[in-house]
């Protein structure tokens, strides 16, 4: 079972997001979808629901409600958490890295 989410470093999370996520995702309101969906407003939304993005059936059917814990769990191993996801990212194995990136995302994706 994945480790419980704990608030991390927003600054370190921003760096991680830039190097690990930004090539496929945007976070700003009204930002475009890229290879992956725009993540603005992701927290409190169900998986597979970003308007205008074409998700796999797996993401839609999983119907995860994204919060700090579910996002952290997903980022540990996306393909294990949602088998059939398009997300090619292998995951963040270090608990600290997941905490940092989720802490950053909580602010950046509002």
From Swiss-Prot:
Post-translational events: Binds 1 heme c group covalently per subunit.
Entry's Gene Ontology molecular function annotations: electron transfer activity; heme binding; metal ion binding
Highest rank taxon of the organism: Eukaryota
GO cellular component entries: mitochondrial intermembrane space
Location(s), subcellular: Mitochondrion intermembrane space
InterPro entries for the chain: Cyt_c-like_dom, Cyt_c-like_dom_sf, Cyt_c_1A/1B
Record-linked PANTHER family: CYTOCHROME C
Principal location: mitochondrion
Name of the molecule in the record: Cytochrome c
One Pfam family this sequence matches: Cytochrom_C
Keyword Transferase carried by entry: no
Family indicated by similarity: Belongs to the cytochrome c family.
Lineage summary: Eukaryota, Fungi, Dikarya, Ascomycota, Saccharomycotina
Sequence positions that bind heme c: 21, 24-25, 87
Keywords linked to the UniProt accession: Electron transport, Heme, Iron, Metal-binding, Mitochondrion, Respiratory chain, Transport
The keyword Transferase is annotated on this UniProt entry: no
Function noted in UniProt: Electron carrier protein. The oxidized form of the cytochrome c heme group can accept an electron from the heme group of the cytochrome c1 subunit of cytochrome reductase. Cytochrome c then transfers this electron to the cytochrome oxidase complex, the final protein carrier in the mitochondrial electron-transport chain.
